[in-house]
Amino acid sequence: MKKKQGVLVLILTVVLIGLLAFTTAVGFGPTGTGSAKNIKTGLDLSGGVSITYQAKGDDPSQEDMDDTVYKLQKRVEDYSEEAQVYQEGDDRITVEIPGVTDANKILEDLGKPGSLEFQDESGNVVLDGSDIAGADGGVTEDQTTGSKQYVVELTLTKDGTTKFAEATAANLKKRISIVYDGETISSPVVQSVISDGKAQISGQQSIEEAKELASIIRIGSLKLELEELRSNVVGAQLGQQAIKTSLIAGAIGLVLVGIFMIIVYALPGVVAALSLAIYTGLELVMLNAFDLTLTLPGIAGIILSIGMAVDANVIIYARIREEIAAGKSVRSAIKTGFEKAMSAIVDGNITTLIAAAVLGAMGSGSVKGFAMTLALGIVLSMFTALVISRLLVNAFYAVGLRDEKFYGKQKERKTIDFLGKRKLFFTISVILILLVPVGMGVSHAKDGKALNYSLEFMGGTSTNVTFNDDMSIDDLDSQVKPVVQEVTGDANIQISKVADSNAVIIKTRSLSLDEREELNQKLVDSFGVDDSKITAESISSTVSSEMRRDAIVAVLIATICMLLYIWFRFKDVRFASSAVLALLHDVMVVLAFYALSRISVGNTFIACMLTI
């Protein structure tokens, strides 16, 4: 790189950082397109819409309720990966969708889940909603004319596959109508016998129409018929002060990392700080561009990818130092340092990207949100480390900063004989791992739970209170939360406001009848609340057993995929097995910490485990 090119690269870098800073702070146009304030945030950060449905009929079975909760969760992920669905009482289901303020629009888009039937021309029901495994709108191309066709791709259950094969064989060249709540929404003609459990419904005029029909079919595949009971807009679960403090802490952390890199690596440290600034700006812009929903687990994914971006720079600059110490010129050391570091950086990021891809494809809820933000962060961190950092280091060299002192001097370090002390370290590891069953056993004997499961895992009690005065979320945190904690002894309390009212929703661990009465009396005494304006219902966990199963299966498959990649990459199964064993060791140590400290195990616990 010539001097003029180096100057141009540095100028463009300053311009890029300024442009990213302007975009994230202000954005473009009247709506501030691209700004950080336009990033979708979850219920914990900005609130959203809450819709409660009631099951029609008497005494729905728990199995049907669980199945309906799970399928609704999959349905509302079209709006946000961070949407929550949970059972309330015996026959109600609540859907909470973050980042939305128009409840009517969601109700219109989501529709009212009702009954779905496939009927032949005689009106006989050949399939119903329980036979549908999935439905998606898509586009295909006519093999003859080359024109686009908008279709709905149907996937049937095992029983549905058998029924549909028989129905299509008996109704060739006849219509099978799709009837939703008594209304015919489509009447496709059977063109052939369909025996593989997959079918297409053609004839839609646009992709939007195809997606709408697919949405209706998915909703109609619920086992229960539901009717809307109530809907409202709820506020954030975290106060502005908590969010502000978190942002300040994050900014301070980035600055400290930049300062540390500069102190340790000199000029390359400056490059690392600039690359980190570009990475952060690109991350915020891309969150906007891909319309991702940001929550606390999502932030954990971003923090992990920032750490990986810094790690990549450390690997590169340590290599450059080693090459200079070995007697190579600065120019040669830069070239060799990047070349030698690339394989380690790429391998480390690809294994993490494999895990993110599997978790994103198979997980749901916060696990899926974590995976998507992590995958985005990994791609950006590789780009900034291998492209931006390389350009900047070469640019600084080209403008005349060529002295070895600018690139940090390799210091003599005392070698620690880890292998020689392996018995000591193995002993420490075994003790830490044994603390897992010990800590979980003690906890289980104490309160019947191996870990301190939060609302997301165990469910609890939802108390609706209408206060006499409007209270901000910060007021609720400082005044109401301590009162609730005093009665319940629960540190894991979620409080959210209902928009345009004085109503507040308080979620705690499951409360007995006596505890509910004590809490009601405490709220009456402390805030003068009318006792008739306090209601309480039991709620299920937002992480259903099916979602937990999906997450566990996803983690296992991700682990196997990483094993296979490492085995393929290094041609030795010992490397793969060692990497996974080290990973399991770290997981067990963190699990021991959670078991002994009794820190709440919820979505943040999932994020913490996934960052390992």
Give, region by region, the residue ranges found by the protein language model.
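A structural signal for conserved, well-ordered secondary-structure elements
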Residues: 1-612
